[in-house]
């Protein structure tokens, strides 16, 4: 069974309310994301998980599969965890609804990894940080990687004395996250860690490696 994709969506974005319905070339931003996902060679099933009827009504004319969820979720991971209870699946890729430039090639690479890896329970796509200025941008999440495993995620790092010595170990999180279904449901039940609250990144829970 190929992994499915779920795009969590809500209108009450803290930094940019209603962002995912922003019109881009005649389509809502999130519809661009959905169509980018459908360009993948391996993903057949794409769902939008939302609590907002406005999102549902905006996307249904395009043929989107909508799963309505509770409005009590504080992050996309818990929203997707509720949605997967209504779907027969084994592995789920979570795609952010504000990534209209998502590369299908990245999604293909992650999907192939999931299909060939039956030991891991969670995956997170990362990319290189090309220059030191990127390291200090607060607009995206960074992570430290040891032996191909993420051990810490953060937005604002401490100052590094020598960027060249660290750039192979510090990478940017690309917004493609995947889970085994059972693990995702259990993960959503865990309480938020203090660092998760500080960094505003929902996949930092109890030092679980990804």
How should each PLM-predicted stretch be described?
Residues 20-24, 67-69, 192-193:
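Short glycine-enriched, charge-decorated loop/helix-capping segments at active-site entrances
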Residues 2-50:
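N-terminal glycine-rich phosphate-binding loop and ensuing alpha1 helix
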Residues 103-193, 207:
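Conserved core of the sugar-phosphate nucleotidyltransferase
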Residues 29-32, 79, 202:
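Well-ordered alpha-helical segments embedded in enzymatic catalytic cores
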């Amino acid at each position: 069974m190929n992994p499915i994709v779920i795009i969590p969506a809500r209108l009450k974005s803290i930094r940019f309310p209603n962002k995912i319905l922003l019109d881009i070339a005649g389509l809502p931003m999130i519809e661009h994301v959905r169509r980018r996902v459908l360009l993948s060679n391996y993903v057949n099933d794409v769902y939008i998980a939302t609590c907002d009827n406005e999102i549902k009504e905006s996307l249904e004319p395009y043929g989107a599969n909508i799963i309505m969820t509770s409005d009590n979720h504080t992050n996309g991971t818990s929203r997707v965890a509720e949605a997967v209870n209504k779907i027969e699946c084994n592995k789920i890729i979570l795609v952010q609804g504000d990534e209209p430039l998502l590369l299908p090639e990245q999604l293909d690479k992650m999907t192939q990894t999931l299909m060939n890896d039956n030991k891991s329970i969670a995956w997170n796509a990362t990319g290189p940080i090309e220059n030191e200025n990127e390291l200090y941008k607060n607009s995206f999440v960074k992570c430290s990687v040891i032996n191909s495993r993420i051990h810490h995620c953060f937005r604002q790092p401490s100052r590094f004395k020598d960027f060249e010595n660290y750039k192979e170990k510090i990478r940017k999180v690309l917004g493609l996250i995947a889970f085994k279904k059972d693990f995702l449901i259990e993960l959503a039940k865990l309480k938020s860690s203090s660092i998760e609250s500080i960094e505003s990144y929902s996949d930092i829970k109890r030092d679980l490696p990804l």
